[in-house]
Amino acid sequence: MHQVISATTNPAKIQAILQAFEEIFGEGSCHITPVAVESGVPEQPFGSEETRAGARNRVGNARRLHPQADFWVAIEAGIDDDATFSWVVIDNGVQRGEARSATLPLPAVILDRVRQGEALGPVMSHYTGIDEIGRKEGAIGVFTAGKLTRSSVYYQAVILALSPFHNAVYR
């Protein structure tokens, strides 16, 4: 059984990690241990590079806390131009997989507040009345009318980031 350290305690992210690992390695193939670690970037990262740096930092910090694990996984959400997206970073001590999620365009009224320094989650909670929306369906669930959720979009990115770990051509 793979010991997987999730560099987050966010249920939406943990669900995506668990589902993706079980899809690739088989049901019951892993045990997820969530840990709260620092990203080293602002609460609301801007741009692809800052967001990816946050995910990489989280993986490194999780690895220092639990060096005996098989995998360390981080999902860092950010804002790039007028959209939200995330970077997924997965490390197994030998190689790393990274993938960027799909992007969701955000309305100007939301972006204005985020650009003024507020994090997307609290802004979305304010507009929707859904407490801790970032730990649930997220802006993705709201603006896709539930057709996608934060977790379902992250799931795809985790699957992509896992590609180097089960395909021999990457080695």
Swiss-Prot record:
- Keywords on this record? Hydrolase, Magnesium, Manganese, Metal-binding, Nucleotide metabolism, Nucleotide-binding
Q: Which reaction does it catalyse?
A: XTP + H2O = XDP + phosphate + H(+); ITP + H2O = IDP + phosphate + H(+)
List the Pfam families hit by this protein, alphabetically.
Answer: NTPase_I-T
**EC top class, as a word:** hydrolase
Q: Which molecular function term from Gene Ontology is one that the record holds? A: nucleotide binding
Function comment:
Phosphatase that hydrolyzes non-canonical purine nucleotides such as XTP and ITP to their respective diphosphate derivatives. Probably excludes non-canonical purines from DNA/RNA precursor pool, thus preventing their incorporation into DNA/RNA and avoiding chromosomal lesions.
Name the UniProt record assigns to this protein: Inosine/xanthosine triphosphatase
Q: Which gene encodes it?
A: yjjX
